[in-house]
Regions:
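Short, low-complexity disordered leader/linker segments with a strong preference
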Residues: 1-36, 389-397
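Immediate post-signal peptide segment of exported/extracytoplasmic ligand-binding proteins
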Residues: 24-39, 66-74, 165-171, 333
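Extracytoplasmic "Venus flytrap"
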Residues: 27-31, 38-58, 80-87, 109-110, ...
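Beta-alpha junction/loop-to-helix N-cap segments that form part of ligand/metal-binding clefts
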Residues: 34, 49-56, 67-140, 207-212, ...
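Short glycine/serine- and small hydrophobic-enriched flexible loop segments
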Residues: 62, 243, 321-329
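Extracytoplasmic ligand/sensor domains, especially the bilobed periplasmic-binding protein
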Residues: 87, 99-205, 253-278, 285
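Extracellular/periplasmic periplasmic-binding protein-like sensory domains
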Residues: 242-317, 374, 387-394
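Segments of small-molecule ligand-sensing domains
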Residues: 302-313, 324-382
């Protein structure tokens, strides 16, 4: 009897070891029928408007599956709400890797959240393509498992500052930034360009992502004499800033990152105050007549009729496009190594965003952005086409 009990105990232990993947050796993330892909994003919380990025990626994966998958494998897609909280990001990613056996992540809003998990993903040899944010710590030094599409915030902020000074002829500029890696990366690019012109910012003011009362910060900008204010903040903070300024009679030329370039949404939630705001942009307009954009727009209308087709939602497709392309080029004998090889051989890939180039020595895909202005009713007015940052130091290394 004791021998039978011992045998049963050993059998249970062995089965449990087989069933549960460990943190140090995650499941391969695919089999003959499916490839498991995931994304985190703020479906709730202060950055909830960015949550549509993760939902938008599903359109591309559904199109792939409708066409029979990639080399016979369908994509099984997982989304987790991290509430724009790095602690929640870590918990969600750990659960996905260790319990679901994820092959790769795409997108992923929040620079702080991404920094919290990038090393964990690399240690578990999980690929991450197209973070929905961009800081230099992602790609310098090269992380063999992380491939960035998003222009570096330093590059974008530098180009926007150049536009303000050279095109708008404004020299009194302030910078309003989220007090984290996202906001501080934009601040670095702003300072780089201002130093190039030998100009001094009239004000640099930080804000916490969850702050609701911005009266003191906006009064400081007004009293500084800033004629233009660049903001590197989340959508909720941006709207509070504009509404606060409207009440104190302060109307600078607002400028922001492409993270706030979903004009239809921003125009709506700001009560029309977003009209006239200038932002960076790194995709074609969502109402463009380009065949690929038309294809995605029609697919979204059919597959997700309750979703609003906008830039944030479409960006989810953009971030996933190069990953799908690499899976196709990796061939039917899929492995992490085969996919990495294909990603490192990406040359002038063009979806609905900028051209993307990766190599084993360079995982920053682009530094080009466009500059748009919000027109009446949330329409897009192009001010400047694709432009690379002439001060980008990373390309000279």
């Amino acid at each position: 009897m004791r021998k039978k009990g011992l045998l049963l105990f050993v059998l249970i232990v062995m089965l449990s070891l087989v069933a549960l993947p460990s943190a140090g050796g995650a499941a391969p993330g695919f089999d003959d029928k499916e490839i498991r892909v995931a994304q985190w994003g703020p479906q709730t919380g202060p950055a909830a408007p960015w949550g549509s990025v993760a939902r938008g990626s599903s359109i591309l994966f559904n199109l792939v599956n409708e066409a029979g998958g990639i080399h016979g494998r369908k994509i099984k897609y997982f989304i987790r709400d991290d509430q724009y909280n790095p602690t929640q990001t870590k918990a969600a990613v750990k659960e996905l890797v260790e319990r679901q056996g994820i092959f790769a992540f795409v997108g992923g809003v929040s620079a702080a959240g991404g920094l919290a998990v990038k090393d964990y993903l690399a240690q578990n040899k999980v690929i991450w393509v197209g973070p929905a944010t961009s800081v230099k710590e992602y790609v310098f030094p090269v992380n063999p498992y992380l491939f960035s599409i998003y222009p570096l915030y330093e590059d974008e902020a530098s180009l926007l500052t150049k536009y303000i000074v050279e095109k708008l002829k404004i020299k009194k500029i302030g910078f309003f930034y989220q007090s984290d890696s996202y906001g501080k990366s934009g601040l670095d690019g702003f300072r780089q360009r201002m130093n190039h012109y030998k100009l001094k910012p009239v004000a640099e003011i930080p804000v916490e992502p969850t702050e609701k009362d911005l009266a003191s910060q906006m009064l400081k900008f007004k009293n500084s004499g800033a004629e233009s204010v660049i903001m590197w903040v989340n959508p909720t903070t941006a709207v509070i800033a504009l509404k606060t300024c409207a009440t104190i009679g302060y109307k600078p030329q607002w400028v922001s990152s492409n993270t706030l370039s979903d004009y239809a949404l921003m125009h709506k939630i700001s009560g029309g105050l977003w009209e006239g705001v200038i932002t960076g942009a790194f995709s074609e307009p969502t109402d463009a007549t380009l065949p690929l954009m038309v294809k995605y727009r029609e697919a979204a209308k059919r597959m997700a009729p309750d979703e609003r087709w906008g830039l944030f939602y479409m960006a989810g497709i953009l971030f996933a496009e190069p990953f799908v392309d690499a899976l196709k080029r990796a061939g039917p004998k899929l492995s992490t190594e085969a996919c990495l090889k294909a990603l490192n051989e990406t040359k002038d890939f063009k979806g609905v965003g900028p051209k993307v180039n990766w190599s084993s020595a360079q995982h920053q895909g682009t530094d080009s952005v466009m500059i748009w202005k919000c027109g009446p009713n949330g329409t897009s007015i192009m001010l400047q086409s694709w432009t690379a940052n002439d001060l980008a130091t990373w390309k000279k290394k």
